Amino acid sequence: MENQIKANNKKEFDEWFKPFSEKLQLRSNLTNSASLCDRVPDLALAEMKMALATDDKEKDSVFSNALVEATRFCAPIYECAWTCSTGVVQKSLSWFDKNKDFIKLWDAKYMDLKKGIPEPEQLVSYQQAAQKWRKDVGYEINQFTRSLTHPVVAEYKVPGELLLMSRMLSDMIRRRNVLLNGDGENAGKKVLISREHVSWGRELAGGKFQVVFNPPWGDINKCGKSGIPLAATAMVKVAELDGSKKLEDIRQALLDLKKWVEDNKDALEDGKGNELVQTMTKHLAKHVELSKKSNALRAQGAQIDTPFSAYYWAWSAGVKPETFFTLSQFLFEMGQSARGGKKMIKALTSTPLRWGKGLINLFADDDFLGNRLYMHPAVLTPGRMSEMGACFGVIPVASPEDAILGSGHSKNILNFKIDTSVQNPCASTIVQLIQNPEIWL
């Protein structure tokens, strides 16, 4: 047995994929990239089972199985096959051997990352490594294999006949805020930045350095309740809303301010001009620090580069090109029915293949210190096994035709369209999964 998706480049892969796709009769009426999906999943049976469930354990089992069924046939087959092709497998596993120094900042500290929250530099290093891997391997062959370079702006619409959705979504937002901000009387309260302060930051970025002489909050050194200068938070918000290029615009405005101060010393009180320049330079440095932490410490699940992390885990666990097909088969079977963390560990322990215990050794500690929402994207958990499944387990590479049976992994759901002209299958499926109040109350 061996990997049957034999291709070293896109041309060879397309030649392999054409007869394969015709045999599977792929379609794209409900998904962005062609899939096996021919209808929006019907989860009525799961809803009935949920209503009859008597405890949380049973409810979790019902929901997990419903998630598998909801995502079983919607995976992007072309992209999954490319990710598992012999050329990508060989190049990716070799890439980590050759780039140990490039990933050292977080790879060498993996045992620490299993236990606690990463440093921002370790997150930035991960992102840089992921981009280098994509370029070196030649992974990006179409719009669905490219990494994002700009924010995704999308409006999700839920059919009005669905009851309790507003209440449910409000509760989900509240729970998210508790995760982000902690529990207590201030939990869920978002720190608001005045529109007036944002306008001030935009004017500064626009080259109007004179706004620093009279900021809307008064003293340029004034801090908010967090102890952070208001000038710094205003600049951070502008960069967040309008793009990181605004940082360079602000830096240029401060250089213009410095030159103006040097040329107009007589118009300023002794020493005040240089003091102002130093103050704004300090605030700019604070802005850079805050921006780095703000960008890096957003939910790490959202920042995970799924194929890159999947290959990192495979490499770290000792998977070789010759044994890759066994991992693919394991993940394919994992997508046939839901497995909790304990069953996952038991299955990995039972396999005679060395990568089984290798993956277990990568799992984050049960007593992880801090908010797991901020766990480094290179750290594996039983839940993140689904990320690997979405890459390597949709098509069992030793027998690709078996993909017709489907394999459910949560990230597959992102392939559903959000187009209302086809009844927004993405929103419809998600709503079916979470509309039952028993799941979220």
Swiss-Prot record:
GO terms for molecular function: RNA binding. It is found in: Virion. The keyword DNA damage does not apply. A motif (DEVD) lies at residues 266-269. The record marks E269, D270 as: Cleavage by host CASP3/caspase 3. Stimulated by divalent cations such as Mn2+, Co2+, and Mg2+. It holds the Pfam family Nairo_nucleo. Its cofactor is Mn(2+). InterPro entries: Nairo_nucleocap (IPR003486). Keywords: Capsid protein, Helical capsid protein, Ribonucleoprotein, RNA-binding, Viral nucleoprotein, Virion. It comes from the Viruses. One of its GO terms (cellular component) is ribonucleoprotein complex. Its main location: virion. The record marks F213, V277, P352 as: Homooligomerization. Probable homooligomer; forms a double superhelical polymer. Monomer. The DEVD motif is a CASP3/caspase 3 cleavage site essential for viral replication in host cell. However, the importance for viral replication is apprently not linked to caspase cleavage. This motif is involved in homooligomerization. This is Nucleoprotein.
